[in-house]
Each structure stands twice: as C-alpha cells, then as structure tokens.
Amino acid sequence: ILLILYDRGNNMNKLKHFLLNSKNINKSSFIWNMAGSMLMAFQSVIMLMIITRTLNLYEAGVFTLAYASANLFLNIGKYGMRNFQVSDVKRQFNFKEYNTSRIITTLLMLIVSLIYVVIATSKNDYSMNKTWIIIWMCLFKIVDSIEDAYLGYYQQENRLDVAGKMLTLRMILTILVFGLGLIFLRDQLMSLMIATVFTTLLLIMFVTLTYPAFRKEESVHKGKVWELLRVCFPLFLGCFLAFYIGNAPKYAIDSLLSDEMQACYGFIAMPVFVIGLLNNFIFSPMIARMSMMWKEQQNKDFFRLFWIQILIIGIITIVCEAGAFVLGVPVLSMLYNTDLAPYKTELLVLLLGGGFLALSGLFVTIMTIIRIQNSQAIGYGIVAVCAYILSPIFVRKYAVMGASVLYLLLMILLCIIFAIMMMIGFKKKRSDA
C-alpha cells in the first residue's frame, strides 16, 4: 500500500493535491475533522472487534489494558498543548517551538512508558507476551503524539481540512493493516509491530507532502521552548490526571479481576466516548472562533455559543441513553461476539458518566480560552486522589458495577469543581477589564 501511495510519479502528485486542496475549506474542515476524529475514537473498537473474532476474550482484555495505558502516556507526549496551540491567536510561540517542545515531551513519554511497564510487570506478574504488547502499543501511540503538533499547526493556519484528511487516511490504512495482520497471522503482538512501523512511515510521507506548503522562516528560541512547556504544564497535568481518572477503574480491574472481565468492562465503556466524540465534531471547529470572540470582547456571542454547546451535550446524552436502553446490549454483544446482557445497567450508568465527561471537556476548553488553565490541575488533582483511593474499594466490593458507579461519581465531581472555577474566572476577568 505504501509503495502504491508513494509512487514518485503521478500517484504522489495526486495525493499531494488531494491533501492540500479543497473547494470549500470550511465544509471540508468539518467533514474531514469529523471523519478523522471518529476513526481515532473508534480505532480501539474496530481493533477489539477483530480481536474477539480472530483470537479470544483474554487477548481482548490484554488489548484493552494496553490501549488504556498507551493513551495515558500519550497525554505526556501531547502535553495538553493542542487547544493552547490552536487558540494562540497572538502567535506567542511559533510552530518550530511547538514542534521542538513536542519532541521533548514525546521522548519523556517513551521513558515513562518503559518505566511503567517494568514496574507493572513486576507487580502484576504479566506474561512476556502481555508486557511486549503494552510496550509496542506505547510505541504505536508515539506517532499520534508527533502528528498532533502538525495537525494543530494546520488548524492554526485555518486548514483543519488538511489535518482532517491526514488523520483520516492514516487511521483507515493503519486499522486495515492491523486487521489484516490479525486475520492472517493470528498474533496480536506481531500485528501491532507491523502496524506501528507502517503508521510511522505513513506519517513521514504525509508530513513530507503537506508541511512545505505551510513552512515559514522561523527560528527556535530555547528560552521560549521551556517557557511553552512551563505555560502548558498545568494543561498537561490536567490531561494526564483526567485520563487517569477516566481509566482508574480499568487499572483496579487489572489488579483485582481477570483479563476477561477487563475485556467486558472495556466493551461496555466504549459508548461512553461517543458522547464526547459527537460533541467534539461540533465544538472543535468553534475553538478558534470562540478564542477570537473572547479576545475581541464579544461576550454576548461567546456565551451564546457556550450555552448552545451545553444544550447539545444534554441532547446527545439523552439520545445515547435512550438508544443504549433499547439497543445497547444487543449491538455491543454482536460487535464484540460476547454476551453482555448481564451488564445492561452498568452500560447506562457509564453512558451518563460520559455526558458529564463531555461537559467537563467543554469547561476545560473554555478555561483554556480565557487563560485560567492553571486552575485545571487543582481540580483534576482532587478528583485523581479520590479515584486512586476509591477505585480498589469499589471494584473489590462491587466488581464491574462498582467500576461503573465510581466512574459516574468522579465525572460529576469533576464538573462541579470546574464549574465553580470557571465562574470565578469569568468574574475575575470582568473585574480586571
């Protein structure tokens, strides 16, 4: 596939033209961002569907933990910088400074991932195969970290369509290669290794084709790189703790229950992110617009969009709950080739938690736009401590139901804390003005 795409003749020029040109940039931005975000969100879902049909429930449980762990460390790589980069309308930092900082954080991501795997393997007595799957999943996600800096830059240049096309094509082809590997090799580790090498080469090709169109004569100032890392540290800490909070039940299940139960929890937790995903389709293109509104003190329009977004989250949550009540268990059981009838209540509880997850994500974005992001780490820190203390208690006593209820309670607490911080931030900004 790579050889066909990267043909130095006509095919390469066609691909370059496709990536860089859109008849209607705004329309293409929405469509391709939606497609790419959906594929990114459902990447694990599709992979799990193939695993449950080609391998077994144990392998699905290993994948669920590996994917959750890799995504946790991906937050170190991305450093919570995407929304800050896109909303940097004053161009406080240039792209080379964003990219240099991303290389630093990605190296840190790799180091921390390896340390975690060594500790977790020793503590939980992982098999060698499980250990290597987690390591390669972390390497697989490093590509997402590097790519995100370029996608953020293209979005900053009002070319979200280019970013969306890159992400969509890479996701489709990577999932295809991983799936074919599982079907023909029946080996999760080998399939993951092949997919990792493939997606790395794919990213290199896409960046080579697109970046020259946006390249500017810029220099990297070391002082500004460290300043960027300092400014975004609260965002990173918030993103890291947020992901830990959302996945704390999975880590407790890994320590206390079986890999098969881990797989079942992962199956019913999948729809949780649908709410945030659907909300992201609508809200992501609005970030730069709302940032400009805030900068130009168009408060009425700013708050109108804010309340519209809250309403949208509520509607999406209600629709998803209704759909899950009627079709959730049959559809998920069919998708994952597993009987999930005993987990219907847990599914509904988790989906409600997903609504509060989306709401907290909106609050986080608004706090970043109005530049009170330092407060986020405090809120996440409080809830993360609660998650660390309560996760083993809930899971040990109530198993999967305990994990589901705990998730909902943590999301509600997070929303309450952020709502208070946001209101204080608005009042402070008004008084400063």
Which ranges hold each PLM region?
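Membrane-water interface segments that mark the loop-to-transmembrane alpha-helix transition
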Residues: 25-40, 66, 72-120, 128, ...
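Signature of the first transmembrane helix
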Residues: 24-79, 110, 175, 233-260, ...
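Transmembrane helical elements of multi-pass membrane transporters/channels
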Residues: 29-44, 48, 169-170, 192-207, ...
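Interhelical loop/hinge segments that connect adjacent transmembrane helices in multipass membrane
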Residues: 3-5, 9-26, 161, 165, ...
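Hydrophobic alpha-helical transmembrane segments
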Residues: 130-138, 165-213, 231, 269-272, ...
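Interfacial segments at transmembrane-helix termini and the short loops linking adjacent helices
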Residues: 58-60, 119-137, 259, 325-355
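Membrane-interface junctions at transmembrane-helix termini in multi-pass inner-membrane proteins
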Residues: 23, 27, 83-94, 142-168, ...
